[in-house]
Amino acid sequence: MQSIVPYHTYEYGDQPEVIATVPGRFHLLGEHLWFAQGDALSVAIDKTLQLSVSRRPDNNFRVYSVSLDDRRRISSTNMRYRKEDRWVNSVKIVIASFFDHGISVSGLNFTVLSEIPSDASLGTPNALKVATGLVLRQLFAPNLTLLELADIIEYANIQGLTSYGHRADIYTALFAKAGTCIRTEYKKKTVIHCAFPPEGYSIILTDSKIPRSIAREELGLALRDCIDAYEFVKKLPDAPKNMHNLTEAFLQESDIPEAVKRRVTYVIRESAAIDTAIKALESGDNQSFVRLIARSQEGLRDRFEISAPELDWLVKRTNELAKNEPDSFVCARLTGKGFGGCTYSILKDEQIPLFTDKMADYERFFGLLPQQYTVKSADGAVVQVLQ
């Protein structure tokens, strides 16, 4: 990735003091379980966002996005979320969260340079929030632990955006290691690393290019239905106090709507899949891992109902490449919010051209031109101090 320093210097006339480089990410399993405090299995990718910063003589903030060619000014007296501020809200809410935690922050010049594909559910807003937190920590709160910083960023999401994204977004950006996937243990606030993918396999991310404007409202309604179903079961008189002990047998024996059973069954199965997936990866049990991914995709399509024909098509084309190979690690699933965004495909290196060739059919069927990225698992965020 090109250096951010010349852009910052040209824009503000001074050298940056601190640069944070944060990876994008995708989720293998579990990203939709945040409301159930479930774990997630994720991968940081070698597409990054850089954020540089230098001090100002006042208490205001300027933010320049190289990628968007957009410049914004932020007043220290107005840190509330505003829809019209769009991407810069990610910076504002983290600064506000530092204020709310009693940490003084003086005026700064920010420059943003990102190579993470936008609008593809690969973590661009999350990377900007984490990068903002890291540079503020370096300048104003160096004694903060990374776990404490993660809490501040999560607070920013909840208070600033009224958003409850999975804690795994933040933990993956901070704690990932190259050559591994990372399990975020939601309740414990800990992580586990596991080698991923196996040797000889590559990760292909395919952006479906489904317009977000079309999907956003439908996605919101679907997620609301899933959360309501879980809360409905949680309030049943004989529901277990610890919902992690909830079983499919309990659902089948309960007099509850079928739609509720269907959605909560997905939560139970996806939660269990995280444990099984780690064991499969550690033991080299490719078949078990591939079955888990296929079952998760089926659940997102049929139980959570947040897939789309375009995503299903991409998954199916991947799985076709694994036919007659019983020990293959080839698998695919949607990743992120759903109703659009990306799928990930784990393919043998020699299968990549075969998969890429199928994209002409995708364009013909759906009238959309997909974008593909071959990525590698990457390390978590890095902070560089220049002055």
Regions found by a protein language model. Give the residues of each.
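Gly/Ser-rich oxyanion-binding loop with an adjacent helix/lid
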Residues: 1-20, 32-39, 84-197, 358, ...
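C-terminal nucleotide
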Residues: 1-29, 50-89, 180-333, 346-387
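Short Gly/aromatic-enriched secondary-structure transition segments
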Residues: 37-44, 222-223
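Short catalytic helix/loop segments, enriched in acidic residues and glycine
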Residues: 44-50
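A structural signal for short, well-ordered beta-strand segments
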Residues: 110-112, 206-208, 343
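Short, mixed-charge aromatic SLiMs
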Residues: 117-121, 153-163, 228-235, 301-302, ...
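Short beta-strand->loop micro-motif that forms the acidic, two-metal-ion catalytic signature
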Residues: 340-346
